[in-house]
C-alpha cells in the first residue's frame, strides 16, 4: 500500500501513532492498556466528518464513492476493531469480543479473518450451533479454501457429537447434500465420527496394562516415598506396586511416633511375609518424634521385624537410650535381625562403666561399618553423682575409663582369653559430645588390635587418658597397617607432636591415602628440625619413617594444629610428601604458619611457599582459611608461584579479614593467563571467600563477569567454617 499524501497526514497522524503505540503495548502483554489506546483511536475515527474521511481515503488512494449515500469509514477502522477484538480475547472478555467480531462481519462480510475470530470466540463460549453456522458461511465465501476454518469446523462437529447424548443434532442441508452425493457416487459408507472419537479419546493405564515383567524397570526409578504415593491412586496400582516389593529399597522414618511406627511394622508383616522368599532393604532410618517413645519403638523394631527381611544399613537415632539398653534389646529381639547387617549407625547415650558397645559389635558378625555418635553420658547412681555435665560427673567418668585401662594392662592373660577379633569391620566412626563425655569409647579394643581389616577410622570428641602412654603416644595405631583413611579431630590430650613422633620412628601404614588431624587447642609449636635425632648422617635416613608413612597421601588436613611453617616446608623439601600423589592440602587456622614478607626465610614459623608449591605441583585443592598472616603483601608469594598451580581447581581463603579484592583479582588474573588453552584462559573452578569483609561486592561481580572463576562463594556474615558431617565431625 502506498503511503498517504501530505493532505491526509496531518489529520491521520494521531490515529497512526495510537495504532503503533497500542500494537507495542499488545506485544508486551499490556492488553488492558492496549485496548484503551485502540478504543480512543476508534473514537477519533468516529469523530471525523465524511469530508475528512474522504480526504484521508484519497491520500491512501482508496475508493471514495458513496452509493446510496452510505457512510465511509477510516482506512484503519477495520484494523482497529480487529485489534480491540484481539485485546478482549486476551483479557478473556468473550462477550465483548463476540460483539466486536459480529460488528466486523457486518462492516466487512468478505473478511475471512473476521469469520475465524468470531468462530473461535463462539467455540470458547461453547455455543456450538452459532459457531457451526458462522464457520460454514465463512467456508462458502472462500470456496472451502481456509485451513483454519476447516479445522474449526471439524472440531465443532466432534464436540457436537459428544454432546448429543440421544438429543436431536443440528443438520446442515449443504453438508447433507454433499454426503449423499458421495455415498451415491462411491458407494462407500463412511465411518461414523462417534467411533473415531471413542478410539481417539481412549485412555491408557500404563501401570495397569503394562506387562508385569516391565514394571520393575519403571518402579526402580522411584523412591520409596514416591511408590507409596503412587499406590494410593487406585487398588489396581496398589496391587501392582506391592507385587514388586524388591523396588522398596529404603525407608526413612525420621521422625516418627509410635502409632505410625506400628502401622509401618504391620505393613512389613502383611506384605513381605506373603511369600517364602528373602527381601533385602538397603537402608532403614528410624528416629522417634517423642523422646518417651524411643524405647518402645526400638523394642518393636528389634523384636517384630519379619525374618524374611535382611537390612544392610540401619540408622537409629535414639539419644536417650544407652548402650546397655540397646544391647539388651538386641539380645532379647534375637540375632536374626543382626546376622546380615552390614552397616550400623547409632546416636545414643554412652555408659562409661560398661563396655556394651563392644557387645553390640559382637551381635553383628558381618558388620563392615559402625558409626557411634554419643550425645550424652550416663553414670551409675552408686557413684554419688549421675548428672551429666558437672565436674563431679566428669571425674567419675574419667575414673571408670582409667580403671578399665589399668585393669586391661595388669591382666594380659585375661585379655588374651577374652579378646574377640572383628574380622569383617572396615570402617569405624566414633563421634562424642566432649562437653558431656570425658572418656575414650572403644579404647580397649583399639589397644588390643581387635579390628585387623580396619581401613577407615574417625575419632572425634574423645578424651585421651593421661595415665596410659600407649594411647597418648598413638601406639595403638600400629595395630592397623592397612588403614587408608584416618580422621582425628577435636580430642582432648591429643597432640600432633606425639603423633609425628610415632610416624618418625615407626613404619605404621602401608598405604594411607587420607589423613586429617585437627587439635582442639594450641599446643607447643611443632618443628621437625628440633625433633631430629643427633646421629651420623648415614644413620638418619634409616631411622626416619616419615616418607614410608606419608608417601601415598592424596589428602592432608592439618587444620587448627600447632605445626610450624618450617615443619611443613621440611615435609615437602625432604620429599616425605609425594607431590605426584597429593591432591588436597588444608592448613587453615594454623597460627604457627606465617608467610614471608621478604626473601629471608629464617624464622621457624615461615612457610616457604615456593618450595612447597614447587614440590606439590599436582595439588587440586588448597585451604588457607583463618590464616592471620594472609594479606595483600603475603599473597604476592602465591601470585609469583602461580605457574606451579597448574592443576588447582578449588581454593578456600575464607575468613581472612585483612585480604582485599585487589590481591585476589591479581591472583585469579595471573592464574587464568598462565593456564591458557585453545578456548582461552582457564578459570579457577571454585573460590571461597566467605567472611572476607575487606573484599568488595564490586570486585566479586567483576570476577564473575570476567569469568575468572566458575563458582564463587561469598557470604560476608558467615562466621563459622565448620559444617558437621560435611567438612567436620566435631559434634559441638
Curated annotation (Swiss-Prot):
UniProt repeat feature LRR, residue ranges: 425-449, 480-505, 509-532, 550-574, 579-602, 616-637, 645-669
A single GO CC term for this protein reads:
nucleus
GO biological process entries? invasive growth in response to glucose limitation; mitotic DNA replication termination; mitotic intra-S DNA damage checkpoint signaling; protein ubiquitination; protein-containing complex disassembly; regulation of DNA replication; SCF-dependent proteasomal ubiquitin-dependent protein catabolic process; silent mating-type cassette heterochromatin formation
Entry-linked InterPro entries:
F-box-like_dom_sf (IPR036047), F-box_dom (IPR001810), Leu-rich_rpt (IPR001611), Leu-rich_rpt_Cys-con_subtyp (IPR006553), LRR_dom_sf (IPR032675), TPR-like_helical_dom_sf (IPR011990)
**Cross-referenced SMART domains:** FBOX (SM00256), LRR_CC (SM00367)
Q: What is the organism of origin for this protein?
A: Saccharomyces cerevisiae (strain ATCC 204508 / S288c)
Give start and end of each F-box domain: 204-251
Cell cycle in keyword set: yes
For this UniProt record, give its keywords in alphabetical order, as a comma-separated list: Cell cycle, Leucine-rich repeat, Nucleus, Phosphoprotein, Repeat, TPR repeat, Ubl conjugation pathway
Gene name as annotated: DIA2
Matches recorded under CDD domains: F-box_ScDIA2-like
Each TPR repeat occupies one of these ranges, namely 15-48, 78-111, 113-145
Q: Which PROSITE patterns match?
A: FBOX (PS50181), LRR (PS51450), TPR_REGION (PS50293)
* PTM-bearing positions, type Phosphoserine: 393
Q: What does this protein do?
A: F-box protein component of a SCF (SKP1-CUL1-F-box protein) E3 ubiquitin-protein ligase complex which mediates the ubiquitination and subsequent proteasomal degradation of target proteins. Probably recognizes and binds to phosphorylated target proteins. The SCF(DIA2) complex is specifically involved in the pheromone induced degradation of phosphorylated TEC1. The SCF(DIA2) complex binds to DNA replication origins.
**Which compartments is it annotated to reside in?**
Nucleus
Oligomer and partners: Component of the SCF(DIA2) complex containing CDC53, SKP1, RBX1 and DIA2. Interacts with SKP1.
Its recorded name reads Protein DIA2
Amino acid at each position: 500500500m502506498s503511503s498517504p499524501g501530505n493532505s491526509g497526514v496531518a489529520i491521520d497522524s494521531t490515529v497512526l501513532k495510537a495504532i503503533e503505540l497500542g500494537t507495542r503495548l499488545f506485544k508486551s502483554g499490556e492488553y488492558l492498556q492496549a485496548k484503551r489506546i485502540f478504543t480512543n483511536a476508534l473514537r477519533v475515527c468516529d469523530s471525523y466528518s465524511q469530508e475528512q474521511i474522504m480526504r484521508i481515503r484519497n491520500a491512501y488512494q482508496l475508493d471514495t464513492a458513496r452509493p446510496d449515500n452510505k457512510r465511509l469509514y477510516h482506512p484503519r477502522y477495520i484494523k482497529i476493531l480487529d485489534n480491540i477484538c484481539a485485546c478482549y480475547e486476551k483479557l478473556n472478555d468473550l462477550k465483548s469480543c463476540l460483539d466486536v467480531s459480529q460488528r466486523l462481519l457486518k462492516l466487512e462480510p468478505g473478511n475471512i479473518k473476521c469469520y475465524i475470530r468470531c468462530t473461535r470466540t463462539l467455540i470458547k463460549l461453547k455455543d456450538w450451533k452459532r459457531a457451526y453456522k458462522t464457520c460454514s458461511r465463512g467456508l462458502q465465501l472462500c470456496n472451502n479454501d481456509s485451513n483454519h476454518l476447516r479445522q474449526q469446523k471439524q472440531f465443532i462437529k466432534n464436540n457436537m457429537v459428544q454432546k448429543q447424548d440421544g438429543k436431536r443434532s443440528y443438520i446442515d442441508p449443504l453438508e447433507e447434500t454433499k454426503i449423499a452425493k458421495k455415498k451415491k457416487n462411491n458407494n462407500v459408507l463412511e465411518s461414523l465420527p462417534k467411533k473415531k472419537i471413542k478410539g481417539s479419546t481412549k485412555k491408557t493405564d500404563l501401570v495397569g496394562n503394562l506387562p508385569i515383567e516391565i514394571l520393575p524397570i519403571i518402579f526402580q526409578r522411584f523412591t520409596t516415598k514416591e511408590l507409596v504415593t503412587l499406590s494410593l491412586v487406585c487398588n489396581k496400582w496398589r496391587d501392582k506396586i506391592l507385587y514388586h516389593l524388591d523396588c522398596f529399597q529404603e525407608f526413612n522414618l525420621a521422625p516418627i511416633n509410635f502409632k505410625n511406627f506400628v502401622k509401618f511394622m504391620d505393613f512389613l508383616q502383611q506384605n513381605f511375609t506373603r511369600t517364602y522368599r528373602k527381601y533385602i532393604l538397603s537402608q532403614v532410618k528410624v528416629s522417634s518424634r517423642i523422646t518417651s517413645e524411643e524405647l518402645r519403638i526400638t523394642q518393636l523394631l528389634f523384636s517384630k521385624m519379619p525374618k524374611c527381611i535382611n537390612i544392610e544399613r540401619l540408622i537409629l537415632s535414639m539419644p536417650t537410650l544407652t548402650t546397655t539398653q540397646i544391647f539388651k534389646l538386641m539380645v532379647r529381639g534375637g540375632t536374626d535381625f543382626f546376622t546380615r547387617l552390614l552397616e550400623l549407625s547409632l546416636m545414643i547415650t554412652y555408659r562409661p562403666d560398661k563396655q556394651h558397645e563392644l557387645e553390640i559389635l559382637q551381635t553383628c558378625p558381618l558388620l563392615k561399618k559402625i558409626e557411634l555418635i554419643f550425645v550424652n553420658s550416663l553414670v551409675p547412681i552408686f557413684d554419688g553423682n549421675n548428672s551429666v555435665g558437672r565436674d563431679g560427673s566428669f571425674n567419675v567418668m574419667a575414673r571408670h575409663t582409667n580403671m578399665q585401662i589399668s585393669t586391661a594392662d595388669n591382666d594380659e592373660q585375661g585379655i588374651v582369653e577374652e579378646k574377640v577379633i572383628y574380622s569383617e569391620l572396615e570402617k569405624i566412626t566414633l563421634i562424642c559430645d566432649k562437653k558431656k563425655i570425658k572418656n575414650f569409647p572403644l579404647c580397649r579394643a583399639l589397644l588390643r588390635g581387635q579390628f585387623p581389616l580396619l581401613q577407615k577410622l574417625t575419632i572425634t570428641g574423645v578424651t585421651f587418658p593421661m595415665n596410659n602412654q600407649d594411647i597418648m603416644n598413638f601406639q595403638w595405631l600400629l595395630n592397623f597397617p592397612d588403614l587408608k583413611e584416618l580422621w582425628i579431630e577435636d580430642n582432648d590430650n591429643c597432640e600432633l607432636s606425639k603423633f609425628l613422633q610415632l610416624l618418625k620412628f615407626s613404619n605404621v601404614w602401608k598405604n594411607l591415602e587420607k589423613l586429617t588431624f585437627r587439635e582442639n587447642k594450641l599446643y607447643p609449636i611443632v618443628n621437625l628440625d628440633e625433633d631430629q635425632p643427633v646421629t651420623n648422617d648415614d644413620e638418619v635416613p634409616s631411622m626416619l619413617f616419615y616418607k614410608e608413612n606419608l608417601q601415598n597421601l592424596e589428602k592432608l588436613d592439618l587444620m587448627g594444629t600447632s605445626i610450624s611453617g618450617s615443619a611443613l616446608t621440611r615435609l615437602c623439601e625432604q620429599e616425605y610428601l609425594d607431590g605426584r600423589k597429593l591432591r588436597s592440602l588444608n592448613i587453615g587456622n594454623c597460627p604457627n604458619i606465617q608467610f614471608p614478607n621478604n626473601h629471608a626465610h629464617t624464622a621457624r614459623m615461615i612457610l616457604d611457599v615456593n618450595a612447597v608449591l614447587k614440590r606439590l605441583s599436582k595439588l587440586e585443592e588448597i585451604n588457607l582459611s583463618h590464616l592471620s598472616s594472609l594479606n595483600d603483601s603475603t599473597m604476592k608469594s602465591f601470585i609469583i608461584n602461580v605457574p606451579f598451580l597448574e592443576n588447582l581447581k578449588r581454593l578456600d581463603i575464607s575468613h581472612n579479614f585483612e585480604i582485599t579484592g585487589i590481591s585476589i583479582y591479581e591472583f585469579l588474573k595471573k592464574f587464568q593467563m598462565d593456564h591458557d588453552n585453545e578456548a582461552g584462559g582457564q578459570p579457577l573452578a571454585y573460590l571461597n571467600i566467605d567472611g572476607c569483609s575487606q573484599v568488595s561486592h564490586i570486585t566479586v561481580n567483576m570476577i564473575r563477569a570476567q569469568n575468572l572463576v566458575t563458582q564463587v562463594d561469598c557470604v560476608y556474615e558467615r562466621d563459622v567454617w565448620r559444617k558437621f558431617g560435611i567438612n567436620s565431625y566435631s559434634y559441638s
